[in-house]
Amino acid sequence: MSEKLQKVLARAGHGSRREIESLIKSGRVSVNGVVAKLGERLEDESSVVRIDGHIVSAKVQEEVICRVLAYYKPEGELCTRHDPEGRRTVFDRLPKIRGSRWISVGRLDANTSGLLLFTTDGELANRLMHPSRQVEREYLVRVFGEVTEQKVRNLVKGVELEDGLARFEDVVYAGGEGMNHTFYVVINEGRNREVRRLWESQECTVSRLKRVRYGDIFLDKKLPRGGWMELDLKEVNYLRELVELRPEKETMLDLSKDNTSRKRERARSQKIRRAVKRHEERVSTSKGRSNNPARRKPKKNAGEQGARNKHR
C-alpha cells in the first residue's frame, strides 16, 4: 500500500495537511535524500523522510494503529513537549511508544485542569481541533462576580471578542453562594482562553476551570489527576466517525466485559495511581518543594456526571 507523503506526515503529527503541502512546495521535505514533490507517494516505512534536514517518523496506513489516550491534566502542567525552564508538561507522564508519538488534541491553559486527549494519528487530531467540525467541549467553571440572567443570555447569544464573535452553546447553573458561582458551559471550538475571555466580557472572573467532556468522551471519575487511560476500539471509532475518517479494525487493548477484564482494569487503575504518586515524589526530590505547584487530593466527581445528565 502507498500513500501521499503529505497525508502520512500529517497523520504523524508534523502539521496539518495544508501545512505539510506548504513545506513540500518550499523544498523543505526530502525522501531518501531527494527533495520531495507535492503528490509524491510513500510505499513503506523503509524510506527516510526529513523535514528541514531532520529525520521524522513516517508510516503508511497499514503500519499504523490509531490509539487515543484520555489524560487528566492537573493544574500547573504545560501543554508543550519541552519547557526550557524545566517545568512539568503534559507529556511527562504519558506511556512511551515505539515508532510513533503522542499528539495532543488541542491544548489547555496551565491553570486549567481536566480532560485532554492524545492520539498517534495527527490527521485525527487536526480534524478534531478544526473549528469547522464544531466538536463540543464541556467545562466545569467557577466564576467570581455578579451573574445575571441577562449576562447568561449574552453569553449564549454571542459577544464580540478581539478575535471575533464567540458564544456558549449551553450554560447550566451548578450551584454556588455569594459572588461565587459554578456552571457547566459548552463551546464547539478551541480558541485561546475562550471560556475565560467570554466570562471576562461580562465582568466576571474565572477562578477555576476544568474540562469534563470532549465530544462524547467524558473525564472518567475513576481517573486520578495526572493519570491516563487508553480508549477502546469503539470509542476510537466514535471519534473517527465524528470527523469522517474511516474506522479502525485493530486496537492495542484486549479487554472484554467479563469479570476478569474488570479486575484487570481495576488493577490497571491502581497501577496508574501508584505511578503518578512515584512521579510526584521524584519531582519533589529533584526540584524541592518551592518549585512544585500545590497538589490536592482528587475529589469524587460522581456529582458532576449527574449534573451533566440533567441538561443533556
Swiss-Prot record:
Entry annotation: catalytic residues: D109 (nucleophile)
Documented EC number(s): 5.4.99.22
Keywords linked to the UniProt accession: Isomerase, RNA-binding, rRNA processing
A Pfam match: PseudoU_synth_2
Keyword Thylakoid: no
A Gene Ontology molecular function term of the record: 23S rRNA pseudouridine(2605) synthase activity
Similarity annotation: Belongs to the pseudouridine synthase RsuA family.
Name assigned to this protein: Ribosomal large subunit pseudouridine synthase B
Naturally occurring in which organism (per UniProt): Vibrio parahaemolyticus serotype O3:K6 (strain RIMD 2210633)
Gene encoding the protein: rluB
